[in-house]
């Protein structure tokens, strides 16, 4: 994920995942065998003052030199879709981070998605999206040339650092609805399944490496849908 002379923007939201990512990357930079530069990028999409203050205090405590950039993404996404602003907000935030990272001379952005985010995304896509979609450890940007997204916490489980106390969610759209979120339902479902099968998390994770294309009715590649019938007679 990291190569010599990279300049990586560590994207900090204020939660435990992004702060753990920032600290681990800082330690890797100090003690690893590769030379790379880091920028600790925090976008303020419209956080409440006490949330922003807590982010700044935690960064100071961890000795992470964050750079905070103001935006009005919360307000804009709410105007665009009053009832369902989350999708638009997520897209706008990602675009803002890419743009700012590129302006700062970075070639990569790093996000704090971990092992549990990966398996929950797989289950969400199947049960709520009617598709099979995972979350790769690295991804080339389609909108920002020569930019790449990496997920260094990809193999780290949330339970490994879940006792740390940080902001759980700084988003004002979800703070009152988090108990009813689809992701939380999936998280609880996996927890229940794990009682009968301790390997359930690992099996979900490995499923994205063991897709048997010959048994699928179709697949998508570069937004183009393909049917199993395209090559059906060729296999006879």
Residue positions per predicted region:
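ATP-dependent adenylation/nucleotidyltransferase module used to activate substrates
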Residues: 1-124, 128, 159-166, 235
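Catalytic subdomain that performs nucleotidyl-dependent activation
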Residues: 38, 108, 116-192
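Short, basic, helix/turn surface patches
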Residues: 90-104, 137-144, 189-209
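Residue-level detector of flexible, active-site-proximal loop/helix-junction positions
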Residues: 47, 73-75, 139-142, 156, ...
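Alpha-helix boundary/capping detector
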Residues: 51, 85, 123, 127, ...
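Secondary-structure transition/capping residues
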Residues: 3, 32, 36, 134, ...
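The feature marks non-catalytic terminal segments
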Residues: 166-236
């Amino acid at each position: 994920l990291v190569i010599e002379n990279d300049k990586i923007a560590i994207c900090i939201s204020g939660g435990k995942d992004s702060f753990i990512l920032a600290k681990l990357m800082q330690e890797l930079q100090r003690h690893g065998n590769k030379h790379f530069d880091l920028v600790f990028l925090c976008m303020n999409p419209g956080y409440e003052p006490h949330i922003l203050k807590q982010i700044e205090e935690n960064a100071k405590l961890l000795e992470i030199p964050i750079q905070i950039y103001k935006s009005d993404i919360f307000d804009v996404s709410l105007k665009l879709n009053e009832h369902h602003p989350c999708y638009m907000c997520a897209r706008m935030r990602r675009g803002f981070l890419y743009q700012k990272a590129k302006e700062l001379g970075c070639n990569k952005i790093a996000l704090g998605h971990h092992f549990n985010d990966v398996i929950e995304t797989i289950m969400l896509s199947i049960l709520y999206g009617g598709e099979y979609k995972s979350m790769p450890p690295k991804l080339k940007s389609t909108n920002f040339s020569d930019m790449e997204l990496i997920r260094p916490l990809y193999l780290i489980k949330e339970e490994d650092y879940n006792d740390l106390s940080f902001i759980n969610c700084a988003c004002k759209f979800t703070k009152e609805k988090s108990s009813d979120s689809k992701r939380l339902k999936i998280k609880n479902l996996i927890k229940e399944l794990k009682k009968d099968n301790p390997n359930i998390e690992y099996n979900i994770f490995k499923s994205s490496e063991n897709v048997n294309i010959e048994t699928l009715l179709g697949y998508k590649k570069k937004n183009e849908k393909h049917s199993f019938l395209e090559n059906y007679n060729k296999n006879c």
